[in-house]
Amino acid sequence: MAKEVFQRTKPHMNVGTIGHVDHGKTTLTAAISIYCSKLNKDAKALKYEDIDNAPEEKARGITINARHIEYETANRHYAHVDCPGHADYIKNMITGAAQMDAAILLVAADSGAEPQTKEHLLLAQRMGIKKIIVFLNKLDLADPELVELVEVEVLELVEKYGFSANTPIIKGSAFGAMSNPEDPEATKCVKELLESMDNYFDLPERDIDKPFLLAVEDVFSISGRGTVATGRIERGVIKVGQEVEIVGIKETRKTTVTGVEMFQKILEQGQAGDNVGLLLRGVDKKDIERGQVLSAPGTITPHKKFKASIYCLTKEEGGRHKPFFPGYRPQFFFRTTDVTGVVALEGKEMVMPGDNVDIVVELISSIAMDKNVEFAVREGGRTVASGRILEILE
């Protein structure tokens, strides 16, 4: 059966749900999907089980990898990524956040902000997300006085991480909306959220004129057709027949794009901001992996050593409790990859939590990088610093 062609009739935006594990991110994602399918006859309703679709996730009832769904409002087409809240899987949340233009922060009204609420806010800010909307969930389970306290606490937190004091707060029960899609009172919170997204989130300016770049998020084989790499196009456009380079981790190699798809629909051209799957000619699944990039030939090169400016999180922000010294070996997260690197300090003996410093990093493997790219630094399952590349050394 021939696939349908994706019709680009509305502006496209990437959003996602972030927040602490079990605060209701996947339930809200399902509630939105079901609500939008009622408004638009072509839309497919996805239930909770469809979004949490890996066997391990079903067993644990938590989201491990970021999941994408699509839906439309009257004014926009949204790609929605459901980010994992579980601490072990926060590196996958970084990949998800790297793909979002704006985020919906879920906070359970009956428990308030939790450690991961803060970590997700910090990561969202570092990944360049400018605006968020707060969804105060599980309203049916919370004492009204507690809800007011949680609201104040969350707004303070949102401001602390650089988001607006006028951040909208939508209150409701995602579970109620998901379970009673025909009840206008139950789905009112979803309706308000979607209206708020259309009005409050600014459509991002896309770097369509720059050379093509896509950070590979996932790779899979389609029997008889070849290998597909998926990810968000960071800049530029891509069409069938164009040559691209696979850069980073392994030897750089060239291939040709033989198919461009978004949400299982054919795209005439993929452009900056789109979450796409690209079919690649003559590439085996083992030849390409998450963390590499696909780029216009000759526009980005792999490197190991760079100078960067970093900010070290304080203990209160979930960072280290003690300083680190030359020879420190954490993981560096760029786009969709994480690589161990060794830190050298210039003219300093140590770096304290809360410091802003310049460091030199040598990674254990080469990755595609360019100046001004932002990254997160993690160790032992937590984010300890965030930074930006100042110059590439080798």
From Swiss-Prot:
Predominant cellular place of this UniProt entry's protein: cytoplasm
UniProt keyword Zinc-finger present: no
InterPro entries for this protein: EF-Tu_GTP-bd, EF-Tu_GTPase, EFTu-like_2, EFTU_2, G_TR_CS, P-loop_NTPase, Small_GTP-bd, T_Tr_GTP-bd_dom
Domain of life: Bacteria
Positions of Mg(2+) binding: 26
EC number: 3.6.5.3
Region feature (G3): 82-85
Annotated segments matching region G1: 19-26
Annotated region (G5), positions in chain: 173-175
Name assigned to this protein: Elongation factor Tu
Amino-acid positions noted as binding GTP in the UniProt annotation, renumbered to this chain: 19-26, 82-86, 137-140
PROSITE patterns noted in UniProt: G_TR_1, G_TR_2
Family from the record: Belongs to the TRAFAC class translation factor GTPase superfamily. Classic translation factor GTPase family. EF-Tu/EF-1A subfamily.
Keyword Nucleotide-binding attached: yes
Pfam families: GTP_EFTU, GTP_EFTU_D2, GTP_EFTU_D3
Catalytic activity as recorded in UniProt: GTP + H2O = GDP + phosphate + H(+)
Subunit and interaction comment: Monomer.
